[in-house]
A protein has these predicted regions:
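Structured, non-membrane catalytic/scaffold regions adjacent to prosthetic-group chemistry
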Residues: 5-163
Length: 163
């Protein structure tokens, strides 16, 4: 395997956004529930993975999120009386943003090649993908919420749940 770097705008595998039409190349499904699928090897030849081919690794079923306005979403900070306890999506979007090129790899990538065999999803080489990610650094969010610099641990909770 090698990396053939090209400009993102020159990337073409006849890939379309999910839901807009057929693709020549698709994710390789290992599990439907929870959703686990790996990037096809042909897409690993490029520096940026097309969004529809970004590998999927979920430990639990996808959460069921009720239909509501995005204006109703908040990040809530719990556990300290000296902080602004929440920030809404509008305020979050107003914070400075950073764009980074990031490669994400599951620790189980190439598990199929391990000898002796081990349990878990039997990934070949496709539990890795690269993309440009844009967002507000967590440090800026926590500063906006007046979190003390003495805090050493943060627990994140989301809408997903499992056993």
């Amino acid at each position: 395997m090698y990396c053939k770097c090209i400009r993102a705008e020159d990337f073409d595998l006849n890939i379309h956004d999910q839901g807009t039409g057929p693709t020549k190349t698709k994710l390789k499904s290992l599990s439907q529930n929870p959703l686990v699928a790996e990037t096809p090897e042909s897409a690993l030849l490029y520096s940026i993975t097309p969004n529809p081919l970004y590998f999927q690794r979920n430990h639990f079923p996808l959460p069921s999120i009720p239909n509501s306005s995005l204006d109703d979403w908040n990040i809530v900070l719990d556990g300290s009386s000296d902080v602004n306890d929440q920030i809404n999506l509008k305020d979050l979007k107003a914070l400075p943003k950073t764009t980074l090129s990031v490669t994400t790899e599951c620790a189980g990538n190439n598990r199929l090649d391990v000898s002796p065999p081990v349990s878990g999803n039997q990934f070949e080489s496709g539990a890795v993908s690269s993309a440009y990610w844009t967002g507000t650094p967590l440090s800026a969010v926590l500063t906006k919420m007046n979190l003390s610099s003495d805090v050493v641990e943060i627990l994140f909770e989301g809408a997903d749940d499992g056993i």
